[in-house]
Amino acid sequence: MSVGKSSLKRAPGEAPGPSFDLTRFMPYRLAVLADDVSATIAQVYVDRFDLTRDQWRILAWLGNHAEMQAKEVGRNAGLDKMQMSRALARLDEKKLVAIKPDAQDRRGNILQLTKQGRALYDKITPLVTAREDYLLAALTPDEAAALDTIIAKLRRQALTLKAHG
């Protein structure tokens, strides 16, 4: 019996056909790993600094740029318009990000860290990179380099598949 819709229709007591082991399915394993890694990193900025993941991503992008277009930050951070809007509103309330109209695009905004935002970014960055270092310490230097290569290859392949449906 092939795996598919027909395999879902079995007589009572009939043994299942070939099984699909979700725990061995690479996308599932990557998602679980990403959740675990993100949760350990998030402990720093959520618990200690009352930031959400989306807020941290915005701060992290702005931390490496003097200023950026809001839509570019959102695209780079993987945030949709609603996520970006909510996170920016809170960062603005906390006076961590300055928002000004984009002179080139009247519909857009330019973002930059405030002094408080820069100070917070400077506090958080060494803490999250220390956690990253701890996680990567489980790998040899060759394994870490291979992981970077594998991630890049899988990302390119996924984007190609996504583009072609």
Please annotate each region the language model reported.
Residues M1-F49:
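N-terminal leader segment of winged-helix/HTH proteins
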Residues S6-P12, N76, A89-A152:
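Charged, amphipathic alpha-helical coiled-coil/dimerization segments
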Residues D21, A39-Q83, L88, A163-G165:
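N-terminal helix-turn-helix DNA-binding core of bacterial DNA-binding proteins
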Residues Y28, R57, A130-Y134:
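Positions in alpha-helical segments
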Residues L30, A34, S38, F49, ...:
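Flexible interhelical turns and helix-capping residues at alpha-helix boundaries
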Residues W61-H65, I150, Q157:
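Short amphipathic alpha-helical elements of helix-turn-helix/winged-helix folds
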Residues Q157-A163:
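A short alpha/beta connector and helix-capping loop motif
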